[in-house]
From Swiss-Prot:
Carbon 2 of the heme B porphyrin ring is defined according to the Fischer nomenclature. The gene is ctaB. GO terms for cellular component: plasma membrane. Belongs to the UbiA prenyltransferase family. Protoheme IX farnesyltransferase subfamily. This is Protoheme IX farnesyltransferase. The chain crosses the membrane at residues 12-32, 36-56, 72-92, 105-124, 130-150, 157-177, 204-224, 228-248, 257-277. One of its GO terms (molecular function) is protoheme IX farnesyltransferase activity. GO terms for biological process: heme O biosynthetic process. It comes from the Archaea. InterPro entries: Protohaem_IX_farnesylTrfase, UbiA_prenyltransferase, UbiA_prenylTrfase_CS, UbiA_sf. It is a multi-pass membrane protein.
Length: 278
């Protein structure tokens, strides 16, 4: 894959872009394909720009971790100065498009999505505190709320409640991955939760958060969703998440934690698709 595409973290940002799209479709009722295309472009550029900036800012951390040592900057595929200019150009273009094409309120949320990931998470919190992902997770709220604001012209309580499905899922997902690579994080000096507390406590916290996230998603669909096809999708995600989380709590093994990570990964996507079916 082209290293400049890798800088965008496509395997990470696609879910945030999907949340923007779903927010719009869920709120709008009738889809304006031109506005949806503009939203997708602005979200992709802004979120992709923040991901590229994360690559630039964390290039020393990436070089110290076996999992990330082959990324474009530590591998020498792209000069850091190029990555910085690239990230800022994408970010600025995405944010400006958000305000110009989408309007003030959606534009604010596009900018906030960038800010929480690039500044709050990457610059302020990542190296300082295990609370890093709890601060940066608001980027997930912002992406959904931006799409919702575009579709409805405002942000209401249902929108905020639904956006917290993304916020709750992010730390449980990231911490489950960090548990597998906890030695990498310790070596790099990054205070991710599984790297700084007892492993048994980490398993308990991550598993409990996964179960809580699944329960919250199910409640959201029962309140705001409609239709059996969507309910079937949500129940499939909830069942896989709860079952593997309970197994991880009981076994407290690396294998069980990885199984939980893999099984719980699709639940947010399934929930977002269920909202579209509603």
């Amino acid at each position: 894959m082209n290293p400049y595409i890798v800088l965008l973290k496509p395997r990470v940002i696609w879910l945030l872009i999907l949340s923007s799209v779903v927010g719009y479709v869920y709120a709008a009722g009738t889809v304006d394909w031109g506005r949806l295309a503009a939203l997708t472009a602005a979200a992709t550029l802004a979120v992709g720009g923040s991901a590229a900036f994360n690559h630039y800012w964390e290039r020393d951390i990436d070089a110290a971790m076996a999992r990330t040592a082959r990324r474009p900057l530590p591998a020498g595929a792209i000069p850091p100065s190029n990555a910085l200019v690239y990230s800022l150009a994408l970010s600025a273009t995405g944010i400006l498009l958000g305000f110009y094409l989408l309007g003030p309120l959606p534009g604010v949320f596009v900018a906030l999505g960038w800010f929480f990931y690039a500044v709050v998470y990457t610059v302020w919190l990542k190296r300082r505190t295990w609370l890093n992902i709890l601060g940066g997770g608001f980027a997930g709220n912002a992406t959904f709320l931006g799409g919702y604001a575009l579709g409805k012209g405002t942000v209401d309580l249902p929108a905020v409640l639904i956006s917290f499905a993304i916020y709750l899922w992010i730390p449980s997902h990231i911490w489950a991955l960090a548990y597998k690579y906890r030695e990498d994080y310790r070596r790099a000096g990054v205070p991710m939760l599984p790297a700084i507390i007892d492993e048994g406590k980490a398993v308990a916290i991550i598993s409990a958060l996964n179960i809580a996230s699944a329960a919250y998603i199910l409640w959201l669909y029962l309140v705001f969703g409609r239709g059996l096809p969507g309910l079937a999708l949500v129940l499939a995600g909830v069942a896989g998440t709860v079952a593997t989380s309970a197994l991880a709590l009981r076994e407290k093994s690396d294998r069980a934690m990885w199984r939980m990570y893999k099984a719980s990964s699709p639940i947010l996507t399934l929930f977002l698709l269920a909202l579209v079916f509603s």
